[in-house]
Amino acid sequence: MADLVPVLTIDGPSGVGKGTVSKIVAARLGWHYLDSGALYRAVAVAADWAAVDVSDTTALVKCAFDTCVNFAECADGEMRVLVNSIDATDVLRMETTGVLASTIASISEVRATLKKRQQMFRRTPGLVADGRDMGTVIFPDAKYKVFLTAKAEERAQRRYKQLMKKGVSVMFGALLEEIRARDARDACRSVAPLKPADDALLIDSTCMEVDEVVAQVLALVTD
């Protein structure tokens, strides 16, 4: 039964390293990996492609229900995301997509539509799920829960370096402002607000290297 499959949830705000840590931990454990944020971004992309008005809840819910999302791992280990059979990986990573996804994620009907789809990722031998409400809403019965945090300034700096490395010109101040705004939206929304589960291990990654965070998370599961 799916309920017997172990789940490790890793929640936290944007830019704390959830995705990087989750992928490494999943690979080390040999478990499946769920990037819940990619699902919301995929719906955001599909809605944008279909010119859906973000104020039209009915249309957005239909879009969330109809959008086909597939994850394909390349030979180099990179995960590509296909939205309605089109590789949308690069579009999903754009800042504008993240902003739209955050707006869409605040709609309760959309979250309800995607909830069951996320829960279907729970398969043997185990699942590492990263997002914002994995441990509080999607998998409240998860055996292992982690909540990652980091100061907004540090998260903005990490994102700034990522974008500069890709040749994308961006203002640090604008990035910091957007991260703070997204934090506020995620924490204050009426449905599934961003917060740690009562039984989650809290890890502040502000001054930590990725391998240090990975070690703490793995210790939670293996010790």
UniProtKB/Swiss-Prot annotation:
GO terms for cellular component: cytoplasm. It catalyses: CMP + ATP = CDP + ADP; dCMP + ATP = dCDP + ADP. The keyword Isomerase does not apply. The keyword ATP-binding applies. InterPro entries: Cytidylate_kin, Cytidylate_kinase_dom, P-loop_NTPase. It is found in: Cytoplasm. It is an enzyme of class 2 (transferase). Keywords: ATP-binding, Cytoplasm, Kinase, Nucleotide-binding, Transferase. Its EC number is 2.7.4.25. GO terms for biological process: pyrimidine nucleotide metabolic process. GO terms for molecular function: ATP binding; CMP kinase activity; dCMP kinase activity. ATP binds at G12, P13, S14, G15, V16, G17, K18, G19, T20. Belongs to the cytidylate kinase family. Type 1 subfamily. HAMAP family: Cytidyl_kinase_type1. This is Cytidylate kinase. It comes from Xylella fastidiosa (strain Temecula1 / ATCC 700964).
